[in-house]
Regions:
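Terminal, non-globular segments
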Residues: 2-498
Length: 498
């Protein structure tokens, strides 16, 4: 890579450090919920996760992290930032292993300003940990395929087990990995031993298996339905670029083009590239794992009626970016690689900057109004309960909170067990009557609400309607779904005292 390109990559790495720790956003539902679960005593976390639907490793790590660094927004997000930062030297090592020093520089560039990795480096969730484990596991597998002795096989089993205990999409990823290794194992004894090591990692999941089966029977993803693979791919490409805006679209599909080049492209001259539809040696297996993971996840989603969120592809993003980076390193000549590198870095910087400046939730705006106008003893009604964790985290402590549907876990946590069935049985009119009964003597009733949540269609509107029939209503904060991922309306109902 020319000196100018190396300088640009070094600048990107320097920028990548603060980008993985800085965002102006308040914690949204998933983040606040993670903190509320992780702050429980370690022995209580497994039982709490039976109401949530995730494996325990990240929550255990976050519990220990918070006991040292505290529970402020920056503190709880820093664990993910450290994981995202630790992935950069592994990305360099991965690129160098498959494409030499040129590939290492390209890999470092693609990973440093990846809006996806930056976003989840600033989120109190397990996705940065997952990407780190996948990168480490890939390096362990590559080393073991060269010499499959026990010293090189044990880390593979441990990493596989850690992945399974971090996110359930690791099941689809490891299933795809097993299929690819099984294909190679027909002729390669080393691949057979690596395959056994990957499967051995499943032993670490066995103690958690009863909880996982219970979660599968009672939690799932009631907030959305299964999606088509085309939707899965297109949404993921947007998230790889940083969101739903033009620069993100260009980056996402640009990375897809580089991915295709990494799978099937080879330079044949100073200005020409040949595409071999059979794929070229080097990264066909990695590309196959990416494709098979999506295929298996799609089939599983339809079979189990579970949905997809683009953050789940954290299990395959490291391999996708690795192949794309190698594709960039295969561009011939001097000018074409520099232009492509500049495009990746500039668009990546735009997407990463968007993460810094974008608030994921309207909770902060709502809390600001409540701090300014609410009085001690006022009622804050949160409908639906999914708005509860983020709102509760930023509310003044002297306000009384009620959530709909009512739950002993709210407002700090969500009870996802049989969520759709419980919501169907909930009675918004009875809830509104209970709010009115409790409002005697209150200066105001404040309702944080949104009607956009699946399984609760029309119910929050019914609560608002019943309260409006009793008290004068004023919309204080309008719901803004164009600006915020998690959005809500704040309505004030004048109470019984002036």
């Amino acid at each position: 890579m020319p000196a100018l390109g190396r300088f640009a990559v070094i600048a990107a790495v320097v920028a990548a450090v603060p980008l993985r720790f800085v965002t102006t956003s308040h914690l949204w539902l998933d983040e606040a919920l993670s903190v509320d679960i992780a702050r429980l005593p370690l022995a209580d976390i497994p039982a709490a996760l039976r109401h949530d639907g995730h494996p325990p490793l990240y929550y255990f790590l976050l519990h220990v992290w918070m006991s040292v660094f505290g529970e402020g927004d920056s503190a709880v997000r820093a664990l993910s930032g450290v994981c995202a930062l630790a992935a950069l030297p592994l990305a360099w090592a991965a690129g160098r292993r498959v494409a030499g020093v040129r590939g290492a520089w390209w890999c470092l560039a693609v990973f440093a300003l990846s809006p996806f990795l930056v976003r989840y480096g600033t989120e109190t969730r397990m996705y940065a940990l997952v990407t780190l484990l996948v990168l480490a596991g890939w390096l362990f597998v590559r080393r073991a395929l060269e010499r499959p002795d026990p010293v090189r096989l044990v880390p593979i089993a441990l990493t596989s087990g850690a992945l399974l205990l971090s996110h359930y999409w690791a099941i689809w990823f490891l299933a795809a990995t097993v299929i690819v290794l099984g294909w190679h194992a027909r002729r390669d004894p080393a691949a057979r031993r690596v395959l056994v090591a990957v499967l051995a990692g499943g032993v670490l999941l066995l103690p958690w298996l009863p909880s996982m089966l219970d979660q599968a029977a009672h939690t799932g993803t009631p907030w959305a339905g299964a999606v088509r693979p085309t939707t899965m791919v297109s949404v993921s490409l947007l998230d790889l670029g940083g969101g739903d805006f033009a620069e993100a679209t260009l980056l996402g599909f640009g990375l897809l083009a580089l991915f295709a080049l990494g799978v099937a492209g080879r330079a044949t001259g100073e200005h020409t590239v040949e595409l071999d539809v059979r794929g070229v040696a080097g990264l066909r297996s990695e590309a196959a794992v990416v494709g098979l993971t999506i295929a298996i996840a799609t089939a599983a989603g339809y079979a189990t009626h579970t949905t997809f969120a683009s953050r789940y592809v954290a299990v395959i993003v490291p391999l996708f970016l690795l192949v794309a980076a190698v594709g960039g390193s295969r561009l011939p000549g001097r000018d074409a690689p520099l232009v492509a590198l500049a495009g990746v870095l500039v668009l990546g910087a735009v997407g990463s900057g968007h993460n810094v400046l974008t608030d994921r939730t309207q909770a902060g705006v709502i809390a600001e109004h409540l701090r300014a106008a609410a009085r001690p003893g006022d009622l804050v009604v949160i409908c639906p309960d999914q708005l509860g964790p983020a709102i509760h985290r930023v509310l003044p402590a002297d306000l009384t909170e009620l959530t709909y549907p009512p739950s002993p876990l709210s407002p700090e946590r969500i009870d996802w067990r049989d969520y759709e069935k419980r919501n169907a049985a909930a009675d918004p009119h009875a809830f509104a009557s209970s709010v009115i009964a409790r409002a005697t003597g209150a200066h105001s009733i404040w309702v944080v609400s949104s009607g956009s949540y699946r399984t609760l269609e029309g119910q929050c509107e019914a609560v608002l309607s019943d309260l409006s029939a009793r008290y004068p209503a004023t919309v204080v904060v309008a719901e803004d779904g164009d600006t915020y991922f998690e959005h809500a309306q704040l309505t004030r109902f004048a109470g019984t005292t002036p």
